[in-house]
Amino acid sequence: NNKCDIEFATSECEMRYQDCGEASSCTALIEECKTSLQEECNQASSDESSTTVRPE
């Protein structure tokens, strides 16, 4: 999943807040957005590994 890719997360979040401008609150929103995308990604990949590695 490319959510895991920091470049993807960055452009996704910058696009989401493109009308926000250069205010410091906008930067904070973008950073928060990137963090949450990456957390979602990490959870998804750990879920996958826990199901696939389960012993028979």
From Swiss-Prot:
**A Gene Ontology BP annotation from the UniProt entry:** sexual reproduction
Q: Which SUPFAM superfamilies match?
A: Mollusk pheromone
Give the domain of life.
Answer: Eukaryota
**Gene Ontology molecular function:** mating pheromone activity
Compartments (UniProt record):
Secreted
Q: In which tissues is it expressed?
A: Produced by the albumen gland of the egg cordons.
The UniProt keyword set, sorted, is: Disulfide bond, Pheromone, Secreted
Q: Please give the Gene3D superfamilies that the UniProt record associates with this protein.
A: Attractin
Q: Name one GO cellular component term.
A: extracellular region
The cross-references to InterPro entries, in alphabetical order and at most eight, read:
Attractin, Attractin_sf
- One Pfam match: Attractin
Q: List the disulfide bonds.
A: 4-41, 13-33, 20-26
Positions in coiled-coil regions: none
- Which ranges does the record mark as transmembrane? none
Give a short account of what the protein does. Answer: Water-borne pheromone that attract the marine mollusk Aplysia into breeding aggregations and coordinate male and female reproductive behavior within the aggregation.
The entry's protein name is: Attractin
Recall the taxonomic lineage recorded for the source organism: Eukaryota, Metazoa, Spiralia, Lophotrochozoa, Mollusca
This chain is encoded by the gene named ATT
